């Protein structure tokens, strides 16, 4: 099966959030199943020096009133084909932000549609988040291409209807309120990045004002859990941590713990309970809860806390103040360092994720891979990946709390600290979480089933019927001219017009 991924990120070249991990790791897992999988993304300025990109493009075209070119290169790790959309609007180091962000990604979606119709035609075009939300709108009338849309974070929804009309001349009834809504309506299949998140977004609490539409399309909505690259994140072979270890020999984890304490300026003590947090410092991630409970928790226990990340100024200020007041026990590193993040995963005893909402979460999977026990709020993908630990039966993977309240987080942290004092059962818990399968191979099988389902769909969905009702029929004379043109040239180059209808060049 020919599958084209369209996304704004692809790890390791471009990674801002979890979407980059998915687009970088899922395609090779699908390729292992025999699919021809390729990725198309904007040609950001930094990519031309990172990748071996030929000077000549493989294809040139025009859309939204401007020329663009598509260059073919290879993924540096997997060797899969990567297509870069070249245009001056993507020059420079910027990935997101700027006054022209809406135009940039709407243009990318438009260019991708042109490329999929006329250059390399996939059977499935897999779109990711609002940046590619207009692709299903423009593709919905092509019976040869099925579209899948993945929701990584429903909170970010793209440009609104009035702006899309100005940029694309696409009428309001083909858009929804914004690009996210348009994709939800027109994509043949929609998936969220965890089963629980797929259910949560259908409620007012997590639906970001789209719960009505999500309930309407629930027949084509599903949740598929993300995975991790188990080869790149393997404590038994990781050359970027001070000592390797495995379930057969955990002694290397103590070496990593000592190295972490030394690196972060903490008091070196192998018996101290160390909690790590690696995250964007935003309200979604629950950092405000940590600041509310840290002082009391440090006073009650001999715990040390390590935080790595960057984000909102008020949260950074609070973490800096906490580190100043509790030197040697609370350390915050207000930037992002990949090597240090690995050391935190390997050297901590527990990993904190008190998220307000969490579509899937990758950090808790990485922490368990390194034998670090997660302390999480039961929300989104954290529900699917971290069942509560029950000491009496030795079941579960971590310590959980339900309400977004400081007292609930405090109670979960105390339970983790008390469990750590019973080292025999704690060691069993470490070994168990290290053996859980969170590989992309497992997730790829679920995506494979979804792709086969959408390509085998013979009857249109109710949503497709509703969309077809808005299609504008051609006058009889145009239909006759089109039939004559098709008889003369059965394989024309096709383009989309602002109404989302397929047409011929010059037609």
Swiss-Prot record:
HAMAP family: Glycogen_synth (MF_00484)
SUPFAM superfamilies reported for this sequence: UDP-Glycosyltransferase/glycogen phosphorylase (SSF53756)
Family: Belongs to the glycosyltransferase 1 family. Bacterial/plant glycogen synthase subfamily.
Catalyzed reactions: [(1->4)-alpha-D-glucosyl](n) + ADP-alpha-D-glucose = [(1->4)-alpha-D-glucosyl](n+1) + ADP + H(+)
Domain of life of the native organism: Bacteria
GO molecular function terms listed in the Swiss-Prot or TrEMBL record: alpha-1,4-glucan glucosyltransferase (ADP-glucose donor) activity; alpha-1,4-glucan glucosyltransferase (UDP-glucose donor) activity
Keywords from the named record: Glycogen biosynthesis, Glycosyltransferase, Transferase
Pathway(s): Glycan biosynthesis; glycogen biosynthesis
Short name of one Pfam family: Glyco_transf_5
Protein function: Synthesizes alpha-1,4-glucan chains using ADP-glucose.
Region (Disordered): 475-507
Signal peptide: none
Organism: Synechococcus sp. (strain RCC307)
Sites where the protein binds ADP-alpha-D-glucose: 15
Protein name per its UniProtKB record: Glycogen synthase
Record InterPro entries: Glyco_trans_1 (IPR001296), GS/SS (IPR011835), Starch_synth_cat_dom (IPR013534)
Biological processes, Gene Ontology terms: glycogen biosynthetic process
Gene3D superfamilies the record matches: Glycogen Phosphorylase B
Enzyme Commission designation: 2.4.1.21
Gene that this sequence comes from: glgA
Feature: compositional bias, Low complexity: 477-494
């Amino acid at each position: 099966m020919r599958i084209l991924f369209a996304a704004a990120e692809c790890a390791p070249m471009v990674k801002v959030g979890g979407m980059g991990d998915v687009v970088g790791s899922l395609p090779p897992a699908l390729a292992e199943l025999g699919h021809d999988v390729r990725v198309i993304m904007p040609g950001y300025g930094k990519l031309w020096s990172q990748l071996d990109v030929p000077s000549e493009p493989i294809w040139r075209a025009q859309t939204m009133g401007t020329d663009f070119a598509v260059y073919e290169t290879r993924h540096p790790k997997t060797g899969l084909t990567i297509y870069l959309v070249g245009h001056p609007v993507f020059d420079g180091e910027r990935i997101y932000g700027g006054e022209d962000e809406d135009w940039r990604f709407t243009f990318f979606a438009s260019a991708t549609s042109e490329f999929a119709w006329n250059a390399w035609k996939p059977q499935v075009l897999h779109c990711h988040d609002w940046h590619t939300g207009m692709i299903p709108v423009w593709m919905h009338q092509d019976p040869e291409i099925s579209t899948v849309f993945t929701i990584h974070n429903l909170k970010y929804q793209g440009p609104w209807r009035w702006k899309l009309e100005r940029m694309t001349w696409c009428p309001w009834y083909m858009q929804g309120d914004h690009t996210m809504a348009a994709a939800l309506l027109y994509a043949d299949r929609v998936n969220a990045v965890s089963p629980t998140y797929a259910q949560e977004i259908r409620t007012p609490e997590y639906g970001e004002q789209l719960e009505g539409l999500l309930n309407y399309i629930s027949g084509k909505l599903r949740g598929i859990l993300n995975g991790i690259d188990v080869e790149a994140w393997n404590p038994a072979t990781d050359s970027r941590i001070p000592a390797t270890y495995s379930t057969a020999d955990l002694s290397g984890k103590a070496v990593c713990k000592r190295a972490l304490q030394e690196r972060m300026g903490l008091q070196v003590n192998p018996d101290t309970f160390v909690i790590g947090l690696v995250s964007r410092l935003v309200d979604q991630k629950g950092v405000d809860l940590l600041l509310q409970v840290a002082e009391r928790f440090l006073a009650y226990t001999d715990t040390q806390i390590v935080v790595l990340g960057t984000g909102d100024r008020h949260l950074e200020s609070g973490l800096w103040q906490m580190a100043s007041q509790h030197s040697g026990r609370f350390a915050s590193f207000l930037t992002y360092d990949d090597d240090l993040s690995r050391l935190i995963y390997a050297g901590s005893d527990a990993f904190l994720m008190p998220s307000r909402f969490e579509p899937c979460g990758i950090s808790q999977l990485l922490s368990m891979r390194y034998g670090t026990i997660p302390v999480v709020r039961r929300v989104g993908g954290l529900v699917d990946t971290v069942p509560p630990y029950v000491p009496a039966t030795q079941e579960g993977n971590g310590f959980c709390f339900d309400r977004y309240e400081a007292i609930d987080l405090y109670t979960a942290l105390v339970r983790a600290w008390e469990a750590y004092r019973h080292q025999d059962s704690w060691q069993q818990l470490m070994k168990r979480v290290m053996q859980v399968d969170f590989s992309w191979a497992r997730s790829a099988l679920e995506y494979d089933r979804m792709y086969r389902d959408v390509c085998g769909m013979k009857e249109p969905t109710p949503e497709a019927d509703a969309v077809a009702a808005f299609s504008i029929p051609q006058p009889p004379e145009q239909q006759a001219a089109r039939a004559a043109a098709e008889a003369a040239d059965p394989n024309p180059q096709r383009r989309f017009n602002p109404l989302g209808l397929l047409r011929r060049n010059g037609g």
